[in-house]
Amino acid sequence: SLVGSEMCIRDRPYTNHRKDEFGGSLENRMRFMDMVMEEVMRAAGNDMAVLVKTNMRDGFKGGMEIDEAVQVAKRLVQDGAHALVLSGGFVSKAPMYVMRGAMPIKSMTHYMNCWWLKYGVRMVGKWMIPTVPFKEAYFLEDALRFRTEIKEIPLVYVGGLVSREKIDEVLDDGFEFVQMGRALLNEPGFVNRLRTEEKARCNCGHSNYCIARMYTIDMACHKHLEEKLPLCLEREIEKLENQ
């Protein structure tokens, strides 16, 4: 994955300040990625497909933009990747760019064990993690640029797919596969409904409660919990889902 990972850090000028052959120009910044891909492709052999998740934009000022990201994607094709998963964002700088919506701060801090971190994030969290509005298939416009530029291998679209109508649109636009996360967490049987219902749409309300608890306990939809949530969290979730 090139979404805030070690390879991502190496090929961004924002995080790569090296002065040697691994820094400076995009060609140099991609050198480490090339080395990793060479080893991965050698290890994979003919036994498995290698899919690489790569950014289209980082989503913050000074991060990688689409023109350079297309060049990175083309290099991954040259390096032997069998398919690319097109994403965006940078976990430490622009987490909601990839997730979209708002971060439920009360839910996030509810599961933190460290008291000073809990209260600190409650005080400044909304400024630390700014909201990025959600819309269905929010990465599609950028992904179409990659589809135009890259013809050699399959592309996997990910980002805000919650209905059969939009999934069909993405596939009709030339993407071989789609990837879903929160839609399936909300409704594990959603794929079965997609097969039989033309108007199928999952019931995810995009409160991001599942994301808020992901790093401290586990990832779960609030609609499928065995325990009852505190009233303050229920109100926070309801407010976000009704925005």
Language model: regions and residue ranges:
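Short, well-ordered coil/turn segments that N-cap beta-strands
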Residues: 44-50, 80-82, 151-155, 175-176
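Glycine-rich tight-turn/loop motif centered on a GG-T
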Residues: 10-33, 61-67, 72, 98-136
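Conserved, mostly hydrophobic/aromatic
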Residues: 40, 52, 76, 84, ...
